[in-house]
Amino acid sequence: KEMPVTIGVFINPGTIPAVRPGGKSRSNRSFEYDSLGSRYATFLIDEFLPAVTKDLNLVDDPQARGIVGISSSGICAFTAAWERPDYFSKVISYIGSFTNIRGGHVYPALIRKTESKPIRVFLQDGENDLDNLHGHWPLANRQMAAALKFAKYDYRFEMGDGGHSGQHGG
């Protein structure tokens, strides 16, 4: 089966330049991507998508729309679909941060206890992914896969041997 014409829209998280020479740039990346709730999905639906698609003739069908992310944007992609499956029905999360950075560790329990949503999920992680004060990424992704299986989601989980890097999903 051939893949239909596809348009990818990529968002770089904004940063605030350092105010002093040698200082660090600041970012709201973790607040925007790792937080649970509908805020980021609302931004995409109400502000971002209308701006980038105004001159494009796109199908208005959530079954034809997906969202992808890696690391913090991996959990962000899942959160957008979880909160708004009427807009995002397919999710790909590479080395997703389903750990306790800003509450993502609760997703396996939520998935098990909440009526299934009309989303398809692909998760991918590596055995040598992060293990730090926020949690253990391979274990967190395994817990996500187990919860999706328990709740009878259409999902796929692939565990490789890589670490926390952009080589995943490539």
Language-model features, listed with the residues they occupy:
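Non-catalytic cap/lid and distal C-terminal segments of serine-dependent acyl enzymes
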Residues: K1-G170
